[in-house]
């Protein structure tokens, strides 16, 4: 099953720094690279990925970060969402939510480790839930 999904930065970070190759974030990340998940993005999302992943605390090489961001750009679809008017706890998260909303007609999901940052919606799922959806 091919799924469209906006993947929150925290999931990408977890996928890249985990020691567990079978962790749900790693499985979601792998699915983005194999085409099981078509990543949806906006330039602001790619910029956030790059900014966060380059933080020293994650010990990731700049080349690794660029490769990841380029792969998401290459395999994904750029979305220019319409404003939803939604007010979120962290307004930096709004672009992730709005990109998912824009592609809801295609069944898009938002995959995040921080569900509390978003309104409760059935399409906002954890990495573990996304792994289960992919198995269907």
Segments (PLM) and residue ranges:
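Acidic, metal-coordinating catalytic cores used for nucleic-acid/nucleotide bond scission
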Residues: 86-92, 116
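Acidic catalytic patch
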Residues: 43-46, 64-88
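Alpha-helix capping/helix-boundary segments
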Residues: 11-12, 45, 96, 116-117
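Acidic, metal-associated active-site segment
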Residues: 90-109
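Intrinsically disordered, low-complexity and often Lys/Arg-enriched segments
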Residues: 1-3
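Acidic, PIN/NYN-like endoribonuclease modules and their adjacent C-terminal/linker elements
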Residues: 105-136
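Membrane interface segments of multi-pass transport proteins and intramembrane proteases
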Residues: 58-59
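PIN/NYN-family metal-dependent endoribonuclease catalytic core
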Residues: 6-7, 19, 24-54
């Amino acid at each position: 099953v091919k799924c469209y999904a906006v993947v929150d930065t925290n999931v990408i970070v977890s996928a890249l720094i985990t020691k567990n190759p079978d962790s749900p974030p790693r499985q979601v990340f792998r699915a983005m690279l194999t085409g099981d998940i078509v990543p949806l993005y906006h330039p602001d999302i790619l910029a956030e990925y790059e900014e966060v992943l380059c933080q020293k605390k994650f010990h990731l090489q700049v080349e690794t970060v660029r490769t990841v961001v380029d792969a998401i750009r290459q395999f994904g679809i750029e979305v220019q969402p319409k404003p939803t008017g939604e007010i979120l706890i962290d307004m930096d998260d709004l672009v992730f939510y709005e990109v998912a909303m824009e592609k809801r007609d295609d069944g898009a999901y938002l995959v995040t480790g921080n569900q509390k940052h978003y309104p409760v919606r059935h399409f906002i799922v954890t990495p573990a839930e996304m792994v289960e959806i992919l198995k269907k």
